[in-house]
């Protein structure tokens, strides 16, 4: 753990994106970020999608500062401040209990943070979850805080607590008013279902018009469907989804994933005024998935959409190549044919004429910008090599950030 030696007061970590298959939408406490229902997610592999964060503390720093993707941001942002306060509170608490490893001097030091995503920020790719999980995890190592970090990460972004673990993760809504029991826990490790694959169909990398925070507040205030969903639908779905994962029941997993995505977006439409995160391409992808499955006479592919138009596709290893070919057929790459597929290697295959007929889609060139092929992955990692630091010895971002 970090000590008072200057070189030990800089830590760099990475954290993953997670994709909910049972959705979180709506808070019962805005300040503590406590959800109106439990949720369940899949952690994606950091080889393809991750946030990298460096945090440094020094007696020479005069103020807290943060840089995101190379640009300095307002460190006074309320959720960022909530994370910093919570970590420092835990560090003080640890010190007051007489823990010999707690940092005696550094609690008063200011912190500099630099963070970068290797994927589009604020485009419905769960960037805030990875970002705040990485912040919490990195700050914990700098300040010598151990134990569960759900509360710290949750203060930044609710779903961030799910990115603190790899594999398949449940965020329990909890019952206590102070949120102490609203925590994330792993229900299966990343190696549990090795055949499972994930494809992210990037429809738009633009910032979404209605942010998640505002969207949730409006839905909680106006949607009766959301209340019914949280109280009467989600509890049973959490049990069923856990069973599907533990038993590797892909058919049931896939169908429930799609139904829950559809119901989440139905609550957005039930919100007043209505919110629509999906666009025409999103709806064409939904149609493509159902036609692909109908052709095969079984559910081989599932979609889910968060608060944005990008599709996340779940399938098994033996179906990836054919479905990627179906996407290429339906959404021919506009100009970047050789860069259309990123991430894991996928062998090209030819679609059968029968499948082309079943898809029956009018090609929509450029509708899908690119595909990221990935799989289930581990939780946050510490990067021990100092060459990975995003901050220089002076505590300022490295020039090549």
Curated annotation (Swiss-Prot):
GO BP of this protein: cholesterol biosynthetic process; isopentenyl diphosphate biosynthetic process, mevalonate pathway; isoprenoid biosynthetic process; positive regulation of cell population proliferation; response to xenobiotic stimulus
Keywords: Acetylation, ATP-binding, Cholesterol biosynthesis, Cholesterol metabolism, Cytoplasm, Lipid biosynthesis, Lipid metabolism, Lyase, Nucleotide-binding, Steroid biosynthesis, Steroid metabolism, Sterol biosynthesis, Sterol metabolism
One GO molecular-function entry: diphosphomevalonate decarboxylase activity
Top-rank EC class of the record's enzyme: lyase
Stored Pfam families: MDD_C, MVD-like_N
Tagged with keyword Cell membrane: no
Catalytic activity from the UniProt record: (R)-5-diphosphomevalonate + ATP = isopentenyl diphosphate + ADP + phosphate + CO2
EC number(s) recorded for this UniProt protein: 4.1.1.33
Membrane spanning stretches: none
Keyword field contains Lipid metabolism: yes
Pathway linked to the protein: Steroid biosynthesis; cholesterol biosynthesis
Role of this protein: Catalyzes the ATP dependent decarboxylation of (R)-5-diphosphomevalonate to form isopentenyl diphosphate (IPP). Functions in the mevalonate (MVA) pathway leading to isopentenyl diphosphate (IPP), a key precursor for the biosynthesis of isoprenoids and sterol synthesis.
NCBIfam families attached to this UniProt entry: mevDPdecarb (TIGR01240)
Protein's UniProt name: Diphosphomevalonate decarboxylase
Lineage: Eukaryota, Metazoa, Chordata, Craniata, Vertebrata
